[in-house]
């Protein structure tokens, strides 16, 4: 006859294995789930962002300015970011100034072509994190700055 402690341990182990199997199944099924995202931006304005959430995840959205220089083929400066906690708050319509300023510390940005890129990371509670990006618009910075 088994003691109550052995029965409790058997029950806890079985429950843990079932939870592990459910997490593995959720992770495997995430490979077939590709979220649809729609976005449009102009230099500093995001008109529309829509993400269909399934209640299992949060979405981290950020806007970067990307440019090239002689030292690096890709430079990224984050201009704005936002966390979408649930599907009720997934439709963004914002008109904001840059949350993080684009500062030219060594005059290497003068006359450069800068492209705005919207990135998003879908972070589920269990499963694979999905990353994607969308190029939005590009512009040239001035050759000289005013003081």
Swiss-Prot record:
TM region positions: 7-29
Cytoplasmic topological domain residue ranges: 1-6
Disulfide bonds: none
UniProt KW Transferase keyword: no
A Pfam family: SPC22
Assigned keywords, A-Z: Endoplasmic reticulum, Membrane, Signal-anchor, Transmembrane, Transmembrane helix
The UniProt record lists the keyword Isomerase: no
UniProt-annotated location(s): Endoplasmic reticulum membrane
GO biological process, one term: signal peptide processing
GO cellular component, as recorded: signal peptidase complex
Membrane topology (Lumenal): 30-147
Membrane topology: Single-pass type II membrane protein
Family: Belongs to the SPCS3 family.
Complexes and interactors: Component of the signal peptidase complex (SPC) composed of a catalytic subunit SEC11 and three accessory subunits SPCS1, SPCS2 and SPCS3. The complex induces a local thinning of the ER membrane which is used to measure the length of the signal peptide (SP) h-region of protein substrates. This ensures the selectivity of the complex towards h-regions shorter than 18-20 amino acids.
Record-linked PANTHER family: MICROSOMAL SIGNAL PEPTIDASE 23 KD SUBUNIT SPC22/23, SIGNAL PEPTIDASE COMPLEX SUBUNIT 3
Role played: Essential component of the signal peptidase complex (SPC) which catalyzes the cleavage of N-terminal signal sequences from nascent proteins as they are translocated into the lumen of the endoplasmic reticulum. Essential for the SPC catalytic activity, possibly by stabilizing and positioning the active center of the complex close to the lumenal surface.
The protein, known as: Signal peptidase complex subunit 3
């Amino acid at each position: 006859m088994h003691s109550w402690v052995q029965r409790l341990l058997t029950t806890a182990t079985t429950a843990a294995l079932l939870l592990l199997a459910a997490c593995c199944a959720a992770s495997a099924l995430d490979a077939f789930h590709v979220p649809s995202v729609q976005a449009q931006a102009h230099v500093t304005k995001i008109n529309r962002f829509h993400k269909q959430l399934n209640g299992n995840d949060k979405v981290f959205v950020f806007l970067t300015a990307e440019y090239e220089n002689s030292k690096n083929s890709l430079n990224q400066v984050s201009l704005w970011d936002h966390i979408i906690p649930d599907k009720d708050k997934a439709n963004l319509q914002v008109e904001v100034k840059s949350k993080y300023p684009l500062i030219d510390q060594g005059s290497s940005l003068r006359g450069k072509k800068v492209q705005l890129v919207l990135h998003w990371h879908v972070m589920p509670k269990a499963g694979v994190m999905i990353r994607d990006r969308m190029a939005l618009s590009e512009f040239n910075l001035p050759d000289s700055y005013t003081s």
